[in-house]
């Protein structure tokens, strides 16, 4: 959201929602002793992805690493923020341009970096159906490829560096079919819509995470079973990497014990079940093939609607995604409340006594430590250099010039995330959605 750790808007978030990074010095602590040109780093960050990558580049430079050899992934998928997650800062159109600034910079200076991970996960967690998850994700990916084309970025290189992020929900066969449909649809889109013949560019490289929204606070031990089935669906659907949620995440951040069980779940599937030894093991099943075809046809229909609206960005600006997701979420919740959709331990087979489980409690002193650290940073840096770097950043954003070089200059001067975000906001404005979801 572009807030520093000492911003009142960040209170309650620090230490609970990812790693708190407000400046280059925070990033240095995080990667202390790690040779950045020998590892691959993944950052789940979107609206402020260019700022975080700029800090990462400066840490690499100052540690003596070769920036051209840096490897990793930044999510940088801003479109889904307007439809699902909500951590946007600027309006959609300039935000896509900002994301492309990062992509263009990496294409020239950090060629081994995966610049966008197009995320259906958050869309599904917000209440979308499996069909909507695939359709909106592919539509967003199309919008990014079109933006890269307009920017003059080599499309074969750009598409080869795209990755995807999907949800693994509880309907095993639907999830397998969904992933199979997405894979062949993306290959066809890249080949037919954009004329890219490279097999690598046509690959649907994707990560999957089990469905956090399916976890229950009631009888949380049952979440181990849910996660196992969802993980199995992801593997059967061909995921290349996987995150399994922990049993207690409906209650709090996971304990070490819960996270270990989640990891062991993956290891049992990988090492004991044999399902990972076969490519597309359910291919040829009458039901799976029929369901894959059905999902693909429905997704094609959704993509046609989005094209008619002018593409993903226009569809989001018109509220199409948001309304569709809200309606689907309402239908699902109503089905649960009426008992038509069974959730074991919640609306059927409920326990008489509430669950008792040890949960992780975050030390509140973390926030005070972060605030003190920022105070020391602001007192020790060259204020004039910071102001000058922020002025140049705002001017670049206003003129439509590439923003990565001035962002890197800001990071070198020890400007904070919040300061950089506000400088860009002066040019782009802040997005405030209007209108009803219904």
Explain the meaning of each model-derived region.
Residues 15-22, 41-52, 62, 87-98, ...:
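Catalytic cores of large soluble enzymes that bind and process phosphate-bearing ligands
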């Amino acid at each position: 959201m572009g807030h520093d750790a000492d911003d009142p808007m960040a209170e309650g978030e620090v230490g609970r929602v990812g790693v708190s990074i407000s400046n280059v010095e925070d990033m240095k602590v995080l990667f202390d002793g790690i040779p950045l040109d020998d590892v691959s780093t993944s950052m789940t960050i979107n609206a402020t992805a260019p700022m975080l990558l700029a800090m990462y580049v400066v840490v690499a430079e100052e540690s003596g690493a070769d920036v051209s050899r840096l490897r990793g992934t930044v999510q940088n998928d801003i479109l889904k923020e307007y439809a699902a997650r909500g951590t946007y800062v600027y309006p959609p159109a300039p935000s896509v341009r900002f994301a492309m600034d990062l992509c263009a910079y990496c294409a020239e200076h950090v060629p081994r970096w995966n610049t966008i991970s197009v995320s259906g996960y958050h869309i599904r967690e917000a209440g979308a159906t499996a069909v909507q998850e695939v359709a909106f994700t592919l539509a967003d990916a199309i919008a990014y490829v079109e933006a890269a084309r307009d920017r003059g970025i080599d499309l074969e290189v750009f598409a080869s560096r795209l990755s995807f992020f999907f949800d693994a929900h509880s309907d095993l066969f639907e999830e397998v079919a969904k992933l199979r449909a997405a894979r062949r649809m993306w290959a066809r889109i890249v080949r037919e819509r954009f004329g890219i013949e490279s097999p690598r560019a046509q690959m649907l490289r994707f990560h999957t995470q089990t469905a956090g929204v399916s976890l229950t606070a009631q009888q949380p031990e049952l979440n181990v079973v849910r996660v196992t089935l969802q993980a199995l669906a992801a593997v059967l659907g061909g995921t290349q990497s996987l995150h399994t949620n922990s049993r207690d995440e409906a209650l709090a951040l996971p304990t070490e014990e819960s996270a270990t069980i989640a990891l062991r779940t993956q290891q049992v599937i990988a090492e004991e079940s044999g399902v990972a030894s076969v490519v597309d093991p359910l291919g040829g099943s009458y039901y799976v093939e029929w369901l894959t075809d059905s999902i693909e046809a429905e997704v094609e229909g959704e993509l046609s609607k989005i094209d008619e609206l002018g593409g993903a960005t226009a569809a989001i600006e018109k509220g199409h995604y948001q309304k569709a997701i809200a309606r689907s979420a309402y239908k699902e919740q109503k089905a649960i409340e009426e008992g038509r959709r069974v959730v074991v331990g919640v609306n059927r087979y409920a326990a008489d006594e509430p669950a008792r489980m040890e949960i992780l409690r975050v030390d509140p002193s973390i926030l005070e430590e972060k605030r003190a650290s920022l105070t020391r940073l602001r007192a020790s840096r060259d204020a004039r250099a910071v102001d000058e770097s922020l002025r140049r950043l705002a001017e670049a954003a206003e003129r439509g010039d590439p923003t990565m070089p001035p962002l890197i200059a800001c990071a070198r001067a020890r400007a904070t995330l919040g300061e950089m975000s506000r400088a860009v906001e002066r040019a782009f404005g802040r997005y405030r959605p209007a209108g009803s979801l219904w």
